[in-house]
């Protein structure tokens, strides 16, 4: 039997079982757990390669073969770290296994034919597109920035650069909801909009859901009182949508205990659980210990560095329409920024106690840094806490699965869309990000939206080949023409779909139904369901989880940072 060295094999077909890959310039190491391809029968496209007529390409008609195949992909997902070919048909993932020509090759479960496009996955790491659940729709240009960083789903609210939207992720009322759904229909990204949940009249909430709100947002800037919380939660249970909350920093309507009493045993998604982004000061972080609360972070506090605290005060003043000349406004801002809880946040992520990562785009967060900040935190925690149980210095698979779940499958489960997006699994929309390992988490090599290229780095358009400088991200065909609608999805609640909102507004996006939001718990958060007893010293702000003090130092230098953005 002919043999090939492990290095030569990796160079040709990508790493296989037992091989390890460093992620960007971090201390994180990935180890391949399983290889679903067949040694000696690998498919690869190119001159003198396998995917040719009668060899790796069969005679199958389009109905019997995939529309695209990603060959020799190294998948990093919550369910595993696996080498496989990925088959895509009609914009969805239909196979994860061995691609090729079943007439001449064994073990083929993904058929390549004349109707199949080839996407080279050799040497690439594949992740699902990120789902950002805390998007302030302040400007449409956010979409380009996010797609170029691997985010393919926006959930949030807003109507543009106006005071209400720069502070709160809310698209309020029927008229605003309709206009934003129409605007989103032109965007090459999946979209779900929050209605205003801060109202004590249940009919004012019902009408927003019936007109397209896939979730509800309670925000202190509109008022986060116990009465409004109870009303919102009651209607959410009735109509099966999720509720997100930015609770009462000033403790005006009640303290933390009043909010949790109003919530009761009903599920809710708590934003920026650490507190710098807002919420009961200083103890909103206690919500990490509630079994019915799905806690999330926003990326400006992640991870804790020597600059984190200094940049937050100015950010907060701008985002919440505060006046630095008013002492009470300054005191409000300062009450939210605590070194101790920011430090604890990193450790809570590493323990799997905070389940979701998001951006808080242009409203104290950076829309293109969801994945990057997540992996920077994972790196920091490996340096400061060592390998997790089951990991080693040379393999961080447990940690990698935990962290990738925070911005893929867990936000999808939280908002009732995990049947459509959130992982590399059969049946789901083919929102897929390909990364060169050296640029993992920072700059994708290719972003697929519904199985078609949507953004990619591209060189001189008048060049003889695609690679000459200057290379920068450019929109591709899934961002163009009618393909935008055919490859992206708008998420709507059942009530809006039954009310005919799609037809009334003439929406052309694919439509995904939000469902199963109200019967979930924190225990359903994959790799991130730890629910410790949280104690907070109200004088020192030191946080304890199950009696363990959560203390760590800020980093002075991060990976995935300046060296990647020199040009």
Swiss-Prot record:
Post-translational modification (record): Carboxylation allows a single lysine to coordinate two nickel ions.
Gene3D superfamilies: Metal-dependent hydrolases (3.20.20.140), Urease, subunit C, domain 1 (2.30.40.10)
Keywords: Cytoplasm, Hydrolase, Metal-binding, Nickel
Sites where the protein binds Ni(2+) 1: 134, 136, 217, 360
Source superkingdom: Bacteria
Catalytic activity: urea + 2 H2O + H(+) = hydrogencarbonate + 2 NH4(+)
Modified residues (N6-carboxylysine): 217
Protein name in UniProt: Urease subunit alpha
Organism: Shewanella halifaxensis (strain HAW-EB4)
């Amino acid at each position: 039997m002919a043999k090939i060295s492990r290095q030569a094999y990796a160079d040709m077909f990508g790493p296989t079982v037992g091989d390890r890959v460093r992620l960007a310039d971090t201390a994180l190491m990935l180890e391949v757990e399983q290889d679903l391809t067949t040694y000696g029968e690998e498919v690869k496209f190119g001159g003198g390669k396998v995917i040719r007529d009668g060899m790796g390409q069969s005679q199958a008609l389009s109905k019997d073969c995939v529309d695209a195949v990603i060959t020799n992909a190294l998948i990093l997902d919550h369910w595993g770290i696996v080498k496989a070919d990925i088959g895509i048909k009609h914009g969805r993932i239909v196979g994860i296994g061995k691609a090729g020509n079943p007439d001449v090759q064994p073990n083929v479960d993904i058929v390549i034919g004349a109707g199949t496009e080839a996407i080279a996955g050799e040497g690439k790491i594949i992740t699902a597109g990120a789902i950002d659940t805390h998007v302030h729709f302040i400007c449409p240009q956010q979409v380009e920035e996010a797609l170029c960083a691997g985010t393919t789903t926006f959930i949030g609210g807003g109507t543009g650069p106006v005071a209400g939207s720069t502070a709160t992720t809310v698209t309020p009322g029927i008229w605003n909801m309709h206009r934003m759904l129409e605007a989103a229909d032109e965007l090459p990204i999946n979209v779900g909009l929050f209605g205003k949940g801060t109202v004590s009249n249940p009919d004012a909430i019902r009408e927003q859901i019936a007109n397209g709100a896939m979730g509800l947002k309670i925000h202190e800037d509109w008022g986060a009182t116990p009465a409004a919380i109870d009303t919102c939660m009651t209607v959410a249970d009735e109509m099966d949508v999720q509720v997100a909350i930015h609770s009462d920093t000033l403790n005006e309507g009640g303290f933390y205990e009043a909010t949790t009493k109003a919530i009761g045993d009903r599920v809710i998604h708590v934003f920026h659980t650490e507190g710098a982004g807002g919420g009961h000061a200083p103890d909103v972080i206690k919500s990490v210990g509630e079994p019915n609360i799905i806690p999330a972070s926003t990326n400006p506090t992640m991870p804790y560095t020597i600059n984190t605290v200094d940049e937050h005060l100015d950010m907060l003043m701008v985002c919440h329409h505060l006046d630095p000349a008013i002492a009470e406004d300054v005191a409000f801002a300062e009450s939210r920024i605590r070194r101790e809880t920011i430090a604890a946040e990193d450790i809570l992520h590493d323990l799997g106690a905070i389940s979701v990562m998001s951006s808080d785009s242009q409203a104290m967060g950076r829309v293109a840094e969801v994945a990057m900040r997540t992996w920077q935190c994972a790196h920091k925690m490996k340096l400061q806490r060592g390998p997790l149980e089951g990991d080693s210095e040379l393999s961080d698979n447990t940690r990698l699965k935990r962290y990738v779940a925070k911005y893929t499958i867990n936000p999808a489960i939280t908002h009732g869309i995990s049947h459509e997006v959130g992982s590399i699994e059969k049946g789901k929309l083919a929102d897929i990000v390909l990364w060169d390992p050296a640029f993992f988490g920072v700059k994708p090599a290719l972003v697929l939206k519904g199985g078609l290229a949507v953004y990619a780095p591209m060189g001189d358009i008048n060049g003889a080949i695609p690679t000459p400088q200057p290379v920068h991200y450019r929109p591709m065909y899934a961002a163009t023409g009618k393909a935008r609608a055919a490859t992206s999805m708008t998420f709507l609640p059942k009530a809006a779909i039954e009310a005919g909102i799609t037809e009334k507004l003439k929406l052309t996006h694919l439509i995904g139904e939000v469902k199963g939001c109200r019967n979930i718990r924190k225990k359903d958060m994959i790799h991130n369901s730890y629910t410790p007893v949280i104690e907070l010293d109200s004088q020192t702000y030191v946080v304890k989880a199950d009696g363990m003090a959560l203390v760590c130092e800020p980093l002075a230098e991060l990976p995935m940072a300046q060296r990647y953005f020199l040009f």
